[in-house]
Curated annotation (Swiss-Prot):
Subcellular location: Cytoplasm
Family: Belongs to the class-II aminoacyl-tRNA synthetase family. Type 1 subfamily.
Record Gene3D superfamilies: Bira Bifunctional Protein, Domain 2, GAD-like domain, Nucleic acid-binding proteins
Gene of this entry: aspS
Name used for this protein in its record: Aspartate--tRNA(Asp/Asn) ligase
Positions annotated to bind ATP: 233-235, 495, 547-550
Organism taxonomic ancestry: Bacteria, Pseudomonadati, Chlorobiota, Chlorobiia, Chlorobiales
Length: 601
């Protein structure tokens, strides 16, 4: 734990004069008082050794048998008991030095032990990082948080948050807290509702994000706002998403353009990574990739750029081809995509069967491929292609003997997504550097999309973003061709945040919503307070809100977001330690004028 702690100022009182992880040879012969938890206890040839742990690390204690009363007390100590000791620092013998401990050159000969809390048997060990079920870890989270890795994660999170505050304050940002009890909004995920006692039949909602408040702060004349904001969404858990609540670095700025925001956020991330992490950013400034380009090259708007594979468009090569499956996908709105995997053309049939199974899971009818072997091209589609077709394909894709190329054909978006899924699948063939951070900005998202179910034009991303070209674009361009000032920041295949330059002009907002089928009256009914504010002097503004939990998860090398949250819920949105959610008393329900009707089993 010494790596995470690094404290240099000790609070000296009757419990301690020093911290365990900071004792060094210069303190030889010095008297010390230490306090902490019994990490391990060992009996060696009549001597009792105790590893005493505090938040800075471990010191080894020695209890000698000549001190019979002290020795007897030490014998009765259980692991994880809390003790305070007095003793003298001595140097260890050369053969007994422990290079894994910061205090490994010294030990403390104990003269007095005070037991503050004698621990009962533990549900799982702290000293040995044994595999323990997540349910048990969450039920006894206060025990789990003593374990070294997760303890360091929580301390790192605190320091990262403090560093974020310092950086943004130096950039003239103002930290402002926005309300936790607010109004419900039906547009996003499910709200957590809070019944009002003073206003029977009415409800507050916990904020899914401070979106409207931060925009109103721009209208209020605050130039740069930020907040480490708690957000609440009633949605299911994932490895990178905690159910119920999460924290985001909420930011908004007035009088900015898209690149201004990029410069500030990527500058902050580069600073944090360089000063607080051993990880490396592969490219800085972060590359900007349009939505159209990222889908064409990587098949997803959340690409892991560490995977050394790219999708190629081979649609023109199959215009008029005798292979009708591909030829029929050369019309407007469709495409033929290829994914080359170098050096894998001689794999067994099982390799290709597994790949085809994955393609079908992604929604494909099958998986066409060509192996370029010594004896010539092989594969299920070779018989449909002429020698000239194969030669053109080989030259266009730079194929060599030993390579294999996989194909996808059909509607552009679905084909891109299937091939993107296969790119990720084949990414497992490569050893990706976990210390490499490949950030990128995804820009130029479409403003609208066609909703097949509703048979209408709908917003594709954020309805409150400014369309590129503003009113002129809305009045003169086909809706599906209009782009928005919307952007995502992605790292190693994980989306850290979405953001946008906001639409602060009421007439453009009415027009944008009108294209999506909303009347002026509907817009006023849903967003009247925002429209009213924008009519009273609103500056151009934009923002973003990267997930703090996800950023900590990436920098701490964790695959599960619950490893960087002190008291997370489980996958079923339950707090096993506190027993929530729980039933409430009839008196509480009566005060709120509520009656519980459970679903019939």
């Amino acid at each position: 734990m010494s790596k995470a702690a690094g404290s240099t100022q000790t609070l000296k009182n009757r419990f301690r004069s020093d911290y365990c992880g900071l004792l060094c040879p210069e303190r030889e012969h010095g008297s010390v008082r230490l306090a902490g938890w019994v990490h391990r206890k060992r009996d060696h040839g009549g001597l009792i050794f105790i590893d005493l742990r505090d938040h800075t690390g471990i010191s080894q204690l020695v209890i000698q048998p000549e001190q019979q009363e002290l020795f007897a007390k030490a014998e009765q100590l259980h692991v994880e008991s809390v003790i305070c000791i007095e003793g003298v620092v001595v140097l260890r013998a050369p053969g007994a030095i422990n290079s894994r401990l910061a205090s490994g050159e010294i030990e403390v000969v104990v003269s007095q032990i005070t037991v503050e809390s004698n621990a009962h048997p533990l549900p799982f060990p702290v000293a040995d990082e044994v595999v323990t079920s997540e349910e048990l870890r969450l039920k006894y989270r206060f025990i789990d948080l003593r374990r070294e890795k997760i303890h360091e994660n929580i301390i790192f999170r605190s320091r990262l948050t403090a560093a974020i505050r310092r950086y943004l304050e130096e950039q003239d940002f103002i930290e402002i807290q926005t309300p936790i009890l607010t109004s419900s909004s039906p547009e996003g995920a499910r709200d957590f509702l809070v019944p009002s006692r003073l206003h029977p039949g009415k409800f507050y909602a916990l904020p899914q994000a401070p979106q409207q408040f931060k925009q109103l702060l721009m209208v209020s004349g605050f130039p740069r706002y930020f907040q480490i904001a708690p957000c609440f969404r009633d949605e299911d858990a994932r490895a990178d998403r905690s159910p119920g609540e999460f924290y985001q670095l909420d930011m908004e700025m007035a009088f900015i353009e898209q690149n201004d925001l990029f410069t500030i956020l990527e500058g902050m991330i580069e600073h944090l990574t360089r000063t607080m992490s051993h990880k490396r950013i592969t490219q800085f400034p972060f590359p900007r990739i349009s939505y159209k380009e990222v889908m064409n090259r990587f098949g997803t708007d959340k690409p892991d750029l560490r995977i050394p594979l790219e999708i190629s468009d081979v649609t023109p090569l199959f215009v008029g081809s005798a292979f009708k499956v591909f030829a029929n996908s050369t019309v407007e709105g469709s495409c033929v995509k290829a994914l080359v995997v170098k050096g894998r053309g001689n794999e067994s049939r099982l390799f290709y069967d597994k790949a085809e199974k994955r393609a079908k899971e992604l929604g494909s009818g099958g998986l066409a491929y060509i192996q370029f072997r010594e004896e010539g091209p092989k594969g299920p589609v070779v018989k449909f292609l002429s020698e000239a077709d194969l030669a053109t394909l080989k030259e266009h894709l730079g194929l060599e003997t030993g390579d294999v190329v996989f194909f996808g054909a059909g509607k552009w978006e679905s084909t891109c997504k299937i091939m993107g899924g296969m790119r990720t699948y084949f990414g497992d063939l490569f050893t990706l550097d976990k210390d490499e951070l490949s950030f990128c900005w995804i820009v130029d998202f479409p403003m609208y999309e066609y909703n097949e179910e509703a048979k209408k034009i709908d917003f594709s991303h954020n309805p409150f973003s400014m369309p590129q070209g503003e009113m002129e674009a809305l009045e003169t361009m086909p809706p599906l061709d209009i782009l928005a000032y919307q952007y995502d920041i992605v790292c190693n295949g994980i989306e850290l945040s979405s953001g946008a330059i906001r639409n602060h002009k009421p007439e453009i907002m009415y027009k944008a919503f009108g294209i999506a089928g909303y009347s002026r009256e509907e817009v006023d009914a849903r967003f009247g307070h925002m429209i009213e504010a924008f009519k009273l002097g609103a500056p151009p503004h934009g923002g973003i809100a990267p997930g703090l939990d996800r950023l900590v998860m990436i920098l701490c090398d964790e695959q599960n977001i619950r490893e960087v949250i002190a008291f997370p819920m489980n996958q079923q949105a339950q707090d096993l330690m506190m027993g929530s959610p729980s039933e409430v008393t009839p008196v509480q329900l009566k005060e709120l004028h509520l009656k519980v009707e459970l679903p019939k089993k």
